[in-house]
Amino acid sequence: MGVMRFAVHPTGLFDDWPEVHRAYISGVDQAAWPTRIEVAGNQLLCRRQNSDSGKLNIAWPVPGFGRPVLATASLPERQHSYILAVELARGKIVQVRNQLAVWQAAGMAIPEDFVPLHREAHRLLARSVAVQHDPAEASEFAQQAIIKECEAAEVLTRSYVSQRLEVRHRQYPQLPTVFGCSLGDSPLAPEQQQQFLSGFNGAAVPLQWRYIEPEEGDYRWETYDAQVDWGMENQLLLRGGPLVDLSPNGLPKWLSQWEHDYWNLQSFVCDFIETVISRYLGRIRIWEIAARPNAGGALALTEENRLTLVAKILEVARQVDQEGQFLLRIDQPWGEYQARGQHKLSPMHFADALVRAGMDLSAINLEIGVGYSPMGSASRDLIDFSRMIDQWSVLGLPLQVTLAFPSAAEHDPNQTTDLEVDARSWKILASEEAQARWIEDYVPLLLAKPSVLAVFWNHLSDAQPHRFPHAGLVRPDGQAKAAHASIVRLRELHW
């Protein structure tokens, strides 16, 4: 078993740093390795099954940026401890420098205010390295370097987004990217319908199996029939699904009696797929056939079972709708869940296995619920977000992205999961203002990416049952949050 050791200063950091136990080591392919975190005094011990060089990924307190996940450069194991702040500063500078080279090679004009920040971060890192005989002093200089380089990364990425959007708007006065939201599993009130239409040109009709067939043979189509009719009347681009949710509690409860009988279970799944696609054939042309098969958790399905099931679902769906487009929802695309040691495949390896097998996938939908645990994604800065999208683009499939971000931290009575809000994960504590500003920062980045064909918000109203607590754009009382105004401004600006 391999062990990587890091010295943490100031030592009092551990007193209010619960995120430390979600840290993990990753390889050169960015896949997370099963990692056990231990704290001993001021030492952070990262235990894993191999001794290969790797990167420590950890949510680190950065004034002005919240607690974004930072990564060290690739480090070999050694007997004496690394100074964690120094290695995080080095890793951030390397990341930004590498991305700078890529964007320069693509012809990007580098903003003038980036250079002094980047240079100052280098200078501070050099000072921290020079005084490593005093870990506390080295950590102080390294922390200053991290702050400067995070500022530099934000300046650089904002400039990239601005330049890319300018180019895209020269090609398309109205962006070809679909901007949509889920209609939820209950009818929208008339005022909510207007709120929806003012912000979006696309709609996801959930068609979730557990709501359509809560008891075997008892189908309830009324809400979804009405949603499809309403979407077509208002000329919205419709996406159906996810039809099958392979996360915990995502399938109908009555199906649990078949969880140890895979072949009968597969038969039930395929029958439902055929039924729902046949019902809306010709009205819905884009189908999200399955959600969260990479992380899983539904019934007793193994990783291999889920791969086989998704392949069979795709086969049946294509037989029913020969002209349809079929996409797969991948959750937690950075793959933090692998650190728990229950998965062999990273999210990208899971999707790649289907692509290499010749499955008829039209696109990948990345579900990114920022600021949630344990089944969400930790906060990351703009440049990290951009790099993740670029990495997924390597698969050669168009991308859709489904987003969620909390507007409050307390318990949400309408949430359908046990997800909790990490209130301090982003630069502003979880609030309606934070949600609005996050949308204004991150949605334009996605719109700047040609590989992203659609951006969807997870749900409109917090009055509906929903997966991500407080992620709606409308309060339970029907009043729009600040985030809804941000969505409307983006719609007016880009479409």
Residue ranges of each PLM-predicted region?
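Aromatic-lined carbohydrate-recognition surfaces of secreted/lumenal glycan-active proteins
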Residues: 175-184, 286-289, 309-345, 366, ...
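Conserved, mostly hydrophobic/aromatic
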Residues: 121, 181, 203, 231, ...
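Amphipathic, heptad-repeat alpha-helical segments
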Residues: 1-22, 57-122
